[in-house]
Amino acid sequence: MTQTWNLLQAGQERNYKVAYINARIIDPETKLDIEGSLLTEGSKIIDFGESLFSNGVPSGVDETINCEGLVLMPGLVDIHVHFREPGQEHKETIYTGSKSAAAGGVTTVVCQPNTTPAIDSVILAKYLKYRALETSHVNIEFYAKITTSEEKLTEVALLKEAGAVGFTDDGIPVMNPMIMRQALLYSSMLNVPIAQHAEDLNLSAGGAINEGKISEALGVKGILSASESVMVSRDILLMKDIENVHYHILHISSKDSLDAVKRAKDLGLNVTCEVTPHHFTLTEDIVKQHGAIAKMNPPLRTEEDRLAMVEGLKTGVIDCIATDHAPHDRSSKDLPLESAAFGIVGLETMLPLSLELYHSGQIDLFDILAKLTYKPADIIHVPRGRVQKNFVADLTLVDLNYEWEIKIDSFASKSKNSPFGGRKVKGRVVRTIVSGKTVYSQK
């Protein structure tokens, strides 16, 4: 297998035309599913259809890509990644993280602000944007911090003007309810999501894995499931009387939290949530096998919780899938459970793990792809994740039925902390296109 990457930088040349022929073209939003061809010019999708190029590709096309046996679909959108820049470049950088994203078919990511220093000022926001323009393979968006040192609100309006698509203190929760209430009021004024790492630290402090049979068997302090659902319930109460507010829950993991979200949605509240592939594929049981490699926050929970996540994806209570891509070097993970860092990498496994729900007949393909493309894009109000005329040409070419084994040593990410090594999956990214430009391909 030969893999090739290209930096995005300015994107495709303005008038450069690419014809994608013999493709199965899927757009989850419009329920489009056809056999046909698609034409891009520069950064845009110009045309597509079953009869396009039926008389052959015209001479004015610069490049023709035969997609026989492959699915051409919107580029994936991951609204929860940690690229560790600035401050922890030994774990990941925008360059290596975006390379990992491209290999996973992800064309847009949202970087979390818990870097060193944190993205809590306009200067740091501008620095991040500059680094992204210089070194990224994919579109880089970012959340800015809700608070400065967890004590007071950041300059939320100025940070939005500087490019922030939302606000979070991810890695830790906003514990102070008055500060959270103020942030939610800004959400209403500025039309941005306030994204909460839902965890009451009074119920979780010092915990390493889910509180339950595995934590008891291993003799380590557990993280109570209620630490998440209590915070979710608190925040829903804080936002319920604010008009035009958007509250988003990061990496939801417990059945009780999901029940609270469903109740809020039934009341018409603008509450959205994301789930990671590891929370709908794995349980706390694998900690016995993988140790600290399977340590993340929120932790892997029970089979009942896992099944609730799958059901939430089926019913639409869960709005999207996101990785919480959290790279760590070996020295951060080769430690006892209590001392090791939280988190796993996920960009290169998100698509095949999500497709397990399709291949097993649990969830419709349109529904899975929707939660990987336009639905996360809509949460952050970014016009991505669609195959439609005159839309930006962010595309992923996938062999839907290709069977392969996950090999973590081959990841493009600088870090290899994943419990999925050796897992057999179906669905492989063949090519990733951002703004009409191929940024990743493999043969």
From Swiss-Prot:
Record has Chloroplast as a keyword: no
Any one Gene Ontology BP term: purine nucleobase catabolic process
Assigned EC number: 3.5.2.3
Binding-site residues, substrate: 82-84, 114, 297, 328, 342-343
Alphabetized Gene3D superfamilies for the sequence: Metal-dependent hydrolases, Urease, subunit C, domain 1
Pathway annotation from the record: Pyrimidine metabolism; UMP biosynthesis via de novo pathway; (S)-dihydroorotate from bicarbonate: step 3/3
The protein, known as: Dihydroorotase
Species per Swiss-Prot/TrEMBL record: Wolbachia sp. subsp. Brugia malayi (strain TRS)
